Amino acid sequence: MLWFQGAIPAAIATAKRSGAVFVVFVAGDDEQSTQMAASWEDDKVTEASSNSFVAIKIDTKSEACLQFSQIYPVVCVPSSFFIGDSGIPLEVIAGSVSADELVTRIHKVRQMHLLKSETSVANGSQSESSVSTPSASFEPNNTCENSQSRNAELCEIPPTSDTKSDTATGGESAGHATSSQEPSGCSDQRPAEDLNIRVERLTKKLEERREEKRKEEEQREIKKEIERRKTGKEMLDYKRKQEEELTKRMLEERNREKAEDRAARERIKQQIALDRAERAARFAKTKEEVEAAKAAALLAKQAEMEVKRESYARERSTVARIQFRLPDGSSFTNQFPSDAPLEEARQFAAQTVGNTYGNFSLATMFPRREFTKEDYKKKLLDLELAPSASVVVLPAGRPTASIVHSSSGDIWTLLGTVLYPFLAIWRLISNFLFSNPPPTQTSVRVTSSEPPNPASSSKSEKREPVRKRVLEKRGDDFKKEGKIYRLRTQDDGEDENNTWNGNSTQQM
């Protein structure tokens, strides 16, 4: 089969020029389409359709098939359409047929086409317009209603052509007119039936289009509903986020208010403490005592701040400031990292003092502790030598107790501690060897120990009047509780006059 290689409009124009039948073969991918294509490729079919036929083959998935189905509904695949000059299908083959059957159909279509061409010779211009109608129908913007109106006009062409041919002859015999009108009547009856079939098909096609539009409208409504729900969900999420942010801001505001309240309470407490101090100062009689009380409060506060500052510095400091005290009373200071071992400090001391004290060790006095070899491997922070500490350099073979203190009392105490064992041994030996002289010695000791007594008694006698005067002076302004004196207040008199019973309740 010689298939036309161009587009459908070009094939229609070629069929119009040659006055041939326009054949459209719609094929798919199924087995019947393959069989029908084989029938079209048969030699008999090719020979039968060689003249007066312009055939084109289109695929069901192509755009050309979609345009063609808008004018000529494709009910099944494969399908073969034989379209005449008027645009009306002369024959439609649905499904697959054998090659012999296809040859028979082709001869039948050729006879119908020849019969149609004989009846339309008188009105060639109208036949050309009928052929041009399918060509225009394949444009994308044409509708099924326009094709239906064109088909109805084409169906009315044969009677008009017959009438004009009769008027043109003007004197021919009635028998000839009758013989020319008989094929015209048959051709009019056949297009009317084809028109009804096409109207039904177009009606079905319109219903299908309406159904498709309805489904598309439903799909659009579903999409709109999905978008609406999505928008609603986004709005809810946005509102929830706003509420969460509002709650977070309210919580932060509440925490800030609590912090401000705590700060205000602390300020009030401090003010109360200051008021109490001022009230206590007002009860003092002299300006010196008031200033002394304020100075004591200030010193206590400074001491407390100093303790806090030192504890904070001890926790935060990364540098240890070590003071090395030498046996001769001199000292030197150096800073070390708080995580450095004690051995580093000892090496620094050894480099500084040189061989003056030979092999020495390190110790602290408060608390009293002499560092061992294991301690030299520990960090200064672990040994509580950070952020600052005072370390004593002890020469080798010298105990910790033999360190020279700046105080003379500490020296005599240290000497007494060292010499006490020797004195005890000497007393035992002397008592054992010299048994007679002990009474004289004791008397001498008594007499030697008696002279200091008058001095001590005189000192105590001198101190008594001073102590009495101090007590008399304190009697009005201070209240004694054991060995502790405190300032008097207005409530002290009531407390002294009140009595207390056994269950700690006060009786007025």
Swiss-Prot record:
Ranges where the record places region Disordered = 117-196, 440-508
- Intramembrane ranges, please list them: 414-434
Query: Which InterPro entries does the entry link to?
Result: Thioredoxin-like_sf, Ubiquitin-like_domsf, UBX_dom
Its subunit composition reads:
Directly interacts with VCP. Interacts with UBQLN1. Forms a complex with VCP and UBQLN1.
- Domain observations: The UBX domain is required for interaction with VCP. The intramembrane domain also contains the signal for ER targeting.
Q: What does this protein do?
A: Involved in endoplasmic reticulum-associated protein degradation (ERAD). Acts as a platform to recruit both UBQLN1 and VCP to the ER during ERAD.
Name used for this protein in its record: UBX domain-containing protein 4
Native source species: Pongo abelii (Sumatran orangutan)
> Mind giving the lineage of the organism this protein is from?
Eukaryota, Metazoa, Chordata, Craniata, Vertebrata
